[in-house]
Amino acid sequence: MQRPLTEAEAADAMRVIMRGEATAAQIAAFALAVTVRGASADNLAGMARAAQEFATPVPRAGGDLLDTCGTGGDGLNTFNISTAAAIVAAACGVRVAKHGNRSASSACGSADVLEELGVRIDLGAEEAAACLDRTGITFLFAPVFHPAFRHTAGPRRELGARTVFNLLGPLCNPSGARLRTLGVPSRELVEPMTEVLERLGVTRALVFHSADGMDELSTAAPAHLVELRDGRRTTHRFDPAEHGLARSRPGDLAGGDRAVNAAVLRRVLAGGRGPARDVVLLNAAAALRVAGVAGTWSDGLRLAASAVDGGAAAGLLDRWAHASWQRADLVEVPA
């Protein structure tokens, strides 16, 4: 590759891959070339736009949907912070379409922990839309909505290393959600990932990387953060300690397997105190700011805490788990 690919060229290459017309060797070579050169906003936007052409859309979704996610790859093996934050945000009235998969770089991905919590993860498009209508939150399992990505599975497995493909998942929410919180594994990715989200039609977003390496807003360290709001981008140094949150220590936010992480989420949603609660409230506050529900970080933290302490978040998780197993043609979730 003598020069960086343009957005159109990256999109064309991705279409060849998604159609199953590229060999495993070609897919691996392409992924490595883009990754080694450094995935640019042009590369990522082109690849994500092309991948979305092959996705199964979510009916009746609407553009006011929120997704909360991290790209993974920070190597810290924390519990599922963005998943917990999504539940709290939904309990505050934000419509959430959580796009995710099983674990790629830790012991437990969003799909794994939700499955452990009783949520059915493999809903089809109509079922996912019905669940969203009933509860205000739904899960979009990447293999169901992006079947064409199966062509990349073999080469990615053989490479055994993170590549540009690992950055695409958070960019390719099949609901068209225009509200995003997105954590990335390096500071250098914050600006390009924000630019890509804007090119893909996202109207409001917070994209961040914490100084301790976390692809979430961490309570252990400040974060480099870019806010996208209706076409304007502003850069901040965000320190949670300035908003009254205690500094967490290494290990305070550690996760484990799906059973361990599910227990952490249930404990937080039940009102348990400590570092896990603080980091969930922080990331939920970010989601509430993006959604326009909270005008300030303090408001976001207060609303998130109220949803947890008043039982709304735990109650929503129970309703979500129940609704996810109902037929799409049922008008209401049976009592």
Swiss-Prot record:
**Pfam families annotated for this entry?**
Glycos_trans_3N, Glycos_transf_3
EC supergroup of this enzyme: transferase
Q: Where does Mg(2+) 1 bind?
A: S82, E216
Give the keywords, sorted.
Amino-acid biosynthesis, Aromatic amino acid biosynthesis, Glycosyltransferase, Magnesium, Metal-binding, Transferase, Tryptophan biosynthesis
State which Enzyme Commission number(s) the record gives. 2.4.2.18
Protein residues bound to Mg(2+) 2: D215, E216
Pathway the protein takes part in: Amino-acid biosynthesis; L-tryptophan biosynthesis; L-tryptophan from chorismate: step 2/5
The residues that the entry says bind anthranilate 1 are: G70, N101
GO terms under biological process: L-tryptophan biosynthetic process
Role of this protein:
Catalyzes the transfer of the phosphoribosyl group of 5-phosphorylribose-1-pyrophosphate (PRPP) to anthranilate to yield N-(5'-phosphoribosyl)-anthranilate (PRA).
Q: What is this protein called?
A: Anthranilate phosphoribosyltransferase 2
